[in-house]
C-alpha cells in the first residue's frame, strides 16, 4: 500500500465507525456499514476522497441505510465533492433504502447549495 494511503487510513481508525479496528482496505466496512470514502465525503475531505478513489474505493458502495457517498455529498451540500464523485463515475440514479436517489436527497436537504447541486446532477452526462 502507498504511504500516503496508509497515513490517511490510519487517521480514520480513530473514527467511531472503525474504533478498535485496523483498516487494511479502502473498501473495509465499519460498524455502521460505511467505508472510509463515505466518512471522507460526510466530512467534506476532498483530498482524502480523491486518494481513496485513486486506490480502488468502490464509488457506489451502499453504506448505512443504503446511502452512497454521492448521497451524502448531496445531503450535506458539498458541491466540489458531488463533482468529484460524478467525474469518477458515481451513479446518480442509485436509490437508498427509502427509495431516494441523489436528486431527491439534494432537493430535500437543508443545504444552501441544493439548487446548484440539483442543477449539476440534472445536467451531468456520464462519459461513455
What are these regions (language model features)?
Residues 18-25, 50-58, 83-91, 120-127:
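Ankyrin repeat domain, specifically the short helix-to-loop turn at the C-terminus of the second helix
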Residues 1-39, 43-51:
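N-terminal segments that cap or nucleate solenoid repeat domains
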Residues 8-13, 39-45, 72-78, 105-112:
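Ankyrin repeat A-helix N-terminal signature
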Residues 47-48, 80-81, 113-117:
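Conserved ankyrin/ankyrin-like repeat signature
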Residues 28-29, 61-62, 93-95:
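Ankyrin repeat boundary signal
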Residues 1-14, 88, 107-128:
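Ankyrin-repeat-protein effector appendages
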Residues 60-76:
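Charged, surface-exposed interaction regions in soluble eukaryotic proteins
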Amino acid at each position: 500500500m502507498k504511504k500516503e494511503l496508509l497515513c490517511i487510513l490510519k487517521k480514520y481508525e480513530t473514527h467511531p465507525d472503525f474504533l478498535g479496528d485496523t483498516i487494511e482496505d479502502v473498501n473495509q466496512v465499519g460498524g455502521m456499514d460505511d467505508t472510509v470514502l463515505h466518512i471522507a465525503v460526510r466530512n467534506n475531505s476532498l483530498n482524502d476522497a480523491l486518494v481513496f478513489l485513486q486506490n480502488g474505493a468502490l464509488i457506489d458502495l451502499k453504506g448505512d441505510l443504503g446511502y452512497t457517498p454521492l448521497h451524502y455529498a448531496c445531503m450535506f451540500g458539498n458541491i466540489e465533492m458531488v463533482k468529484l464523485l460524478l467525474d469518477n463515475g458515481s451513479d446518480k440514479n442509485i436509490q437508498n433504502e427509502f427509495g431516494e436517489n441523489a436528486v431527491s436527497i439534494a432537493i430535500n436537504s437543508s443545504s444552501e447549495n441544493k439548487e446548484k447541486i440539483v442543477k449539476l446532477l440534472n445536467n451531468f452526462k456520464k462519459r461513455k
